[in-house]
From Swiss-Prot:
Subcellular location: Cytoplasm
Function, in words: Required for rescue of stalled ribosomes mediated by trans-translation. Binds to transfer-messenger RNA (tmRNA), required for stable association of tmRNA with ribosomes. tmRNA and SmpB together mimic tRNA shape, replacing the anticodon stem-loop with SmpB. tmRNA is encoded by the ssrA gene; the 2 termini fold to resemble tRNA(Ala) and it encodes a 'tag peptide', a short internal open reading frame. During trans-translation Ala-aminoacylated tmRNA acts like a tRNA, entering the A-site of stalled ribosomes, displacing the stalled mRNA.
Gene designation per UniProt: smpB
GO cellular component, one term: cytosol
Name of the protein described by the UniProt record: SsrA-binding protein
Domain of life the protein comes from: Bacteria
Any one biological process term the GO annotation gives: trans-translation
Any one GO molecular function term: RNA binding
Length: 155
């Protein structure tokens, strides 16, 4: 766990497979009461999510937060756009890096820190199919080497 990181509620493993993560940044999320209760119950899905900068504000889209069961009329739409809390300079930097360079902002994980839901946002570049195959091959080779070293060291 990184410094200051709390309980991890959800991770986006698909993002690390589909993208090369260049940089990460922590952002707060503007949530309603029933949404934060669902997040604390780990009823959140980051798989198809992405973030974008519009009018100097950061917005999170396509992240599914399941409706809170006891929330009845106060429940929000599960995949609504949610505002991200970042400093102005951070937003300007992210906007500059994503504009026209093939970079995108993907949510990597949601965790609770001091009672607040935080989002780890990744500045990412898409991988091609051959890049994915290369990383899978590299991972398998490292696994085989580790297995052989383990067997060698136990003899």
């Amino acid at each position: 766990m990184a410094k200051g990181e709390g309980k991890v509620v959800a991770q986006n493993k698909k993002a690390r497979h589909d993208y090369t993560i260049v940089d990460t940044i922590e952002a707060g999320m503007v949530l309603t009461g029933t949404e934060i209760k669902s997040v604390r119950a780990a009823r959140i899905n980051l798989k198809d999510g992405f973030a974008q900068i519009k009018n100097g504000e950061a917005w999170l889209s396509n992240v599914h937060i399941a409706p809170y069961e006891e929330g009845n009329i106060w429940n929000q739409e599960p995949e609504r756009r949610r505002k991200l809390l970042l400093h102005k300079k951070q937003i300007q930097k992210l906007e500059q890096e994503t504009k026209g360079t093939g970079m995108t902002l993907v949510p990597l994980k949601v965790y609770l820190k001091d009672g607040y839901a935080k989002l780890l946002l990744g500045l990412a570049k898409g991988k091609h199919d051959y890049d994915k195959r290369e990383s899978i091959k590299r991972r398998e080779q490292n696994r085989d080497i580790a297995r052989q070293m383990k067997n060698f060291n136990t003899r």
